[in-house]
């Protein structure tokens, strides 16, 4: 099995064993020393570098497939903070869509549709129980519960 082109930890991922997507993260030997923009696709035997995300981050929420993924938040170590950005991948490019109400990292996420038109991001750094829903209708986020 081929290794990834860019070694990293705290990365986002989507897809299946035979068709995956890996994006963002931090240097494997020193997480927190600089975030990575890189996106790579897996075809079951090798990794290929494709178009990068717009915002480099570590510990972001992610879900979807290798042709339709979504990523939420994450830490941006260049600015020593968390971001509130949400980006969607369409199989070719990443596009920033509706942002989270509060920037945070290391939360959980999931989607119920293969095209990521409905997804949630919950919890995260700062011991929050906040849950936000992303809906493709107008590409907006709404807070379901927050504290």
Description of each model-found segment:
Residues 1-147:
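Polar, enzyme-active/binding microenvironments
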